UniProtKB/Swiss-Prot annotation:
Localisation per UniProt entry: Cell inner membrane
Transmembrane segments: 1-21
Organism per entry: Rickettsia rickettsii (strain Sheila Smith)
Origin: domain of life: Bacteria
UniProt topology in membrane: Single-pass membrane protein
Protein name per UniProt: Sec-independent protein translocase protein TatA
GO molecular function term, any single one: protein transmembrane transporter activity
Gene3D superfamilies, per database record: 1.20.5.3310
Keyword Nucleotide-binding attributed: no
Protein transport keyword on record: yes
Gene assigned in the entry: tatA
HAMAP family xrefs: TatA_E
Any one Gene Ontology BP term: protein transport by the Tat complex
Described purpose of this protein according to its UniProt entry: Part of the twin-arginine translocation (Tat) system that transports large folded proteins containing a characteristic twin-arginine motif in their signal peptide across membranes. TatA could form the protein-conducting channel of the Tat system.
């Protein structure tokens, strides 16, 4: 059971209320940087395992 569009809107509204309009761009920027770092880390992790075999 996945998230529907209405569930996504509710979550975004809650985030908007918690962080406010001023901090929201900074929060989204930090989230995007964190996701990119995670993906890069996963990519690096797979190549290290291949070298050790």
């Amino acid at each position: 059971m996945g998230m529907s569009f209405s569930h996504l809107l509710i979550v975004l509204l809650i985030i908007f209320v918690l962080f406010g309009a001023g901090k929201l761009p900074q929060v989204m920027s930090d989230l995007a940087k964190g996701l990119k770092a995670f993906k890069d880390g996963m990519k690096d992790d797979g190549s290290d395992n291949d070298k050790n075999k």
